[in-house]
Amino acid sequence: MQLEGQKIKKAILTALADPEMVRIINPTMYQSKSVCDIIMESKMPHTTAYRKIKWLVDQDLLVIDRICITDEGKKYSLFLSVFRSIVVKYENIKIMIEAEQNIDPVNRLTERFFSL
């Protein structure tokens, strides 16, 4: 699908230009991951990971796929990338971004919500 909004285009270009954000997006494209999993896989400092994940969620590039509760009663979120692939094309003065949605995480969340 062709993306038209300037806000989402700017967010995607910013995320792809930041190597740490790319290291967060890559493992969450195919499987939901917790912040701890992302930190372990990317060997990124905790504060950096939390800050970048918050930014990605605020920009709608990452969604909370699930909220889990441990046996001790602690909550943690599993994150999933909104896009499966992104193609950026710059021609003359126009930036065109095509993105393939990630198996529509919004529909999955809606289905889970109504199945409760």
Map each language-model feature to its residues:
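Linker/hinge segments immediately adjacent to helix-turn-helix/homeobox DNA-binding domains
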Residues: 1-5
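Short, cationic-aromatic polyanion-contact patches
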Residues: 6-19, 34, 65-90
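N-terminal helix-turn-helix DNA-binding core of bacterial DNA-binding proteins
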Residues: 11-44
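Basic amphipathic alpha-helical segments that dock to polyanions
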Residues: 38, 49-59
